[in-house]
Structures are given as C-alpha cells and as structure tokens.
Amino acid sequence: MLRSTTGVGDVIGVDQRFAEVGDGRREAEHGITAYADLEDALPRVDAVVIATPPASHAPLALKAIAAGKHVLVEKPMATTTAAARMLVDAAAAAGVVLMPGHTFEHNAAVHKLRDLVRGGHLGRLFYLDCARLNLGLYQSDVNVIFDLAPHDISISNFVLGATPTAVTVWGSRHVHPEHEDVAYLRLDYADLGVRSNIHVSWLDPRKVRRVTAVGSKKMVVYDDMADGERIRIYDKSAIPPDENAAPLSGVAYHLGDVVSPFVPFAEPLAVQDQHFVDCIASNSTPCVSGSSGLAVVQALECAQISLREQRPVALAEVAQRQAGSPAGLDATIAWTSVG
C-alpha cells in the first residue's frame, strides 16, 4: 500500500530475519530493497513507518527521529507516558512529523459518528459503548488492553473532542498465564459528564467492531463489520417522567425510524498513509498528532495501574511521571523513502 501512495518513491524494508538469507533472495521474495539492520537503512530514507511489537515502538522511533526522519508509528505510540512524551518532545525539537497509527481516526464512518455527536443530533450525549471482540489473536508480549483498546480510546477521544479524566479497568486471564484476554474499561470524561465503556476480548465467538452512542433524543451505532451500513441512526429515546406528574408515572419511550446514511468508503490505512506523506511535503502537523498518541498512552498507563490496583486512576496521576525508559530493539520495521 505504501508504494501506491502519491509522493512515495522507494520503499525499503528492515527485518532482522533478513540476516538469515542473501540479498538477492530477500529482495526477490519481498520486492523491495531490504536490510537486516536499521542502521544501514537510515541514511537511505526520509521517513519511517514502524509496525513492530509495542515495547519497541518508542526506542525505534527515537532512533529515527534522532536521525532526522519523519515517523509514523503503529498504536500504541509507546508503552509508558514518559516514553510517549519523549517522542513528542524529540520530534518537536528535530522539526519532523510524528504521527501515531490511529487508523480509525481516518475512517469516514467514525467521522460521521463524530459529526452526529458533536453536532447535537443525538441531543445530550449520555454515553459511548465500544466493543472490540474476536477469537484471538493472542499476543505474547502484551495483554488485550494494549492490543485492542488503543483503537477505542482514540475513537472515544476523537468523537468527544476530549481526553478522559480517569480510567477504571476490570480484566481477567483465561487462556494465557501472564496476559489478560478479556477486559472492560470505563473512561470518565468528567468535563463532559460522559463515560465511554470499552469491552475488549481475545476470547469471543464473534468478531465485533462496534461503537454505540446514546443520547437523550437519538442513538447511533457504528458497526465496522456491516458492509454498506456502517452507520445506523435510531430515532429512539427514553423520556423521563414529568417532575410534576403523579409518583407512579413511568418512563415513556419514543420509537421512530432507523436511518442508514450513505457514507463514502475510503480505505482508512490508505488515507492515513497519504496524510502522513502530505504532512511531510507541506511541513504541517498531522490531524492525528503525537499529542493524540500521548493521550492514548496516558489512558493505557492508567488502565494498567487500575488493573493492578483495582481502583479508578486519574490521568493527572500519570501525566507527569517520568519513570521508565524505552527499551527493546528486537523488532520488524518497515521504512519508506519519500520522493
């Protein structure tokens, strides 16, 4: 997909497994110039795309930024708030583009959901409910929260135009002895009076990718698995009893139409890649910036503390933490030369 992006010249690959085969074979098999060591590739590229295990994201990105390269890094941008802040500060100091791979923020259906919520079409927003479920794929280096929740945290922040003030998590291990495979997160957006509830699982019979927004007047379901009808608007609501009515008066219900507006589809990954290249060419800040990635990592760190200590954790508690240092360079990485 990178090679079909307007503005991209050569694509160079870096994978430590390439050290096991000869130059001709690795280039013939992958169709790109390939290196086993990133130090050899850095002088030949203008920008870097990092798609590696999460623990390696920050150290690899820092190395690329130090070499003056623009960076698109897969979610999560880092595994600690301190490391994510280092990336943001380093990119600003180097004058390079830093963009986290929050792919769903480039999804037209998610943009439609945001417009409906922020435009007041649902009335007063009560809550968001997100579900990201499937049977697998189990990861060996992170739990289900770090694997799947970054998507729904970024979607929630994007739709609401805010960051959570606190995170509460419940999680459990059923198959993997070290990593939670099912988790429930509650993100409190106290300034908005809204919560986003997130259910992530590697242990579910169905593949679910869904966000529900419930308001005082209408409700919306974004279902990424629904071909052609990813957005469905429900003219439904619950009407509270009149405060002047008799004590036994109950809740009334409004049941109206269900509408699925046409939302033109464009592959989000392609949109993301093109935006990254365009930002490099125009020397502009991405719509999904390093600060967006930092906010997601802060929520993830809160989630890990909440999971361990079984309590709500405020983002303010981890926002200033500088403990921990990025480590771990054993990874697969893709590099792209922009020309």
Where are these predicted regions, by residue range?
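A short helix->loop->beta-strand "cap" motif at the edges of active sites that frequently abuts
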Residues: 8, 32, 67-69, 94-96, ...
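Contiguous beta-strand/loop segments that form the cofactor/metal-binding neighborhood of enzyme cores
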Residues: 150-238, 262-284, 301-302, 318-339
